[in-house]
A protein has these predicted regions:
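Auxiliary Fe-S-binding modules of radical SAM enzymes
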Residues: 1-17, 209, 216-312
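Canonical Radical SAM [4Fe-4S] cluster-binding loop centered on the CxxxCxxC motif
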Residues: 11-49
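Hydrophobic residues in beta-strands and at strand termini
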Residues: 22-24, 107, 286
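Conserved non-cysteine loop/helix-boundary elements of the Radical SAM core domain that shape
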Residues: 39-52, 58-60, 73-202, 206-226
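Glycine-rich phosphate/diphosphate-binding loops that line cofactor/substrate pockets in enzymes
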Residues: 62-65
């Protein structure tokens, strides 16, 4: 490493996110790994469902400095235009009556263009998350993503042009993935410079093409340890660039196999500290919410010591 202090960063703003799940809506194809309906356990929400969900969250959640409604789980900007606008109008109602501060959504990189970005910008959308998964051309093909890496670069550029914050969602450990694929994704962060990322270690969801390939013996899963180490590679690449990693792993549910530790984020961060120590890195700047990971790493490397720093 050729920099003096490795700085672990965390998201500085933690708004209350009110999720509205639109599982697989807008998706024009099925990626090899995806089954959003089983992951979320919900189907298409009506406008009444949206209103009920938002009001319910607002009624029992502790007030925070910021509150946002998020349309997750599908390809929001690929919805039929009138359906998308109906959801947007419902969200805008809550913004304009002062109940929430902004809207956000998730979508595919190939479903962002200047027209749609302008609609989002003019409708109080401040964050858009792109399901990138990988920046390796070969792996994108294996995942059946039907777009290339250049499309990701272009969509990020468009969103930034309109002043919309960008989050990127990556997958690690897909069965066809190689170490080189992860290195390509990690390196791409230097150009993409998202505002934050999420990392989802691979889980073989039921009724997905790749799960059937695993079951038939066509392809094998990587070991959990291999997947965790590749997750660490991407995690450290983000940390080096001071890009917050706001989540690691899918939410737990009855339809998501329990492959990884419940404290997955802490485990990955601890492995990151351990890797840095092994490589000879001697100074880390660790925010409060990484201290558990530091203590976990200290069990492996007892010589690690914590010192107070005014910048930490």
């Amino acid at each position: 490493m050729n920099f003096k202090m490795f700085r672990f960063v965390a998201a500085t703003q933690k708004p209350l996110i009110i999720p509205v799940f639109i599982p697989h809506l807008g998706c024009k194809r099925q990626c090899a790994f995806c089954n959003q309906r089983d992951v979320t356990g919900v189907t298409e929400p009506t406008l009444e469902d949206v209103e009920t969900a938002v009001k319910s969250y607002l009624s029992w959640s502790k007030p925070r400095e910021r509150t946002e409604i998020s349309f997750y789980g599908g390809t929001f900007t690929a919805l039929p235009r009138e359906k998308m606008m109906n959801y947007i109008r419902k969200g805008v109602e809550f913004v304009e009556n002062g109940k929430v501060n902004a809207l956000r959504c998730s979508t595919r990189p190939d479903e962002i263009d200047e027209e749609r970005a302008e609609i989002l910008k003019n409708s109080h959308f401040e964050v858009v998350e792109l399901g990138v998964q990988s920046m390796s051309e070969s792996l994108l093909g294996k995942m059946k993503r039907a777009h290339d890496a250049e499309t990701v670069f272009k969509s990020v550029e468009i969103l930034k042009k309109f002043g919309i914050s960008v989050g990127l969602q990556f997958m690690t450990g897909f069965p066809y993935e190689t170490e080189k694929d992860i290195e390509i994704s990690a390196k791409s962060l230097e150009v993409l410079r998202p505002d934050f990322i999420r990392i989802y270690p691979f889980v073989p969801l039921k009724n997905t093409p790749v799960e059937r390939e695993i079951s038939s013996g066509t392809v094998q899963m990587h070991s959990v340890e291999t997947i965790l180490e590749r997750t660490v590679t991407l995690f450290l690449a983000a940390m080096k660039l001071e890009i917050p990693v706001i989540r690691i792993g899918l939410p737990q549910s009855s339809d998501v196999p329990e492959i990884y530790p419940a404290n997955l984020f802490q485990v990955v961060a601890a492995k990151a500290v351990s890797r840095l120590a092994t490589e000879g890195e001697t100074e880390f700047c660790i925010p409060d919410n990484f201290k558990t990971s530091f203590n976990m790493a200290k069990k492996e490397f007892p010589f690690l010591e914590k010192t107070e720093d005014s910048d930490s």
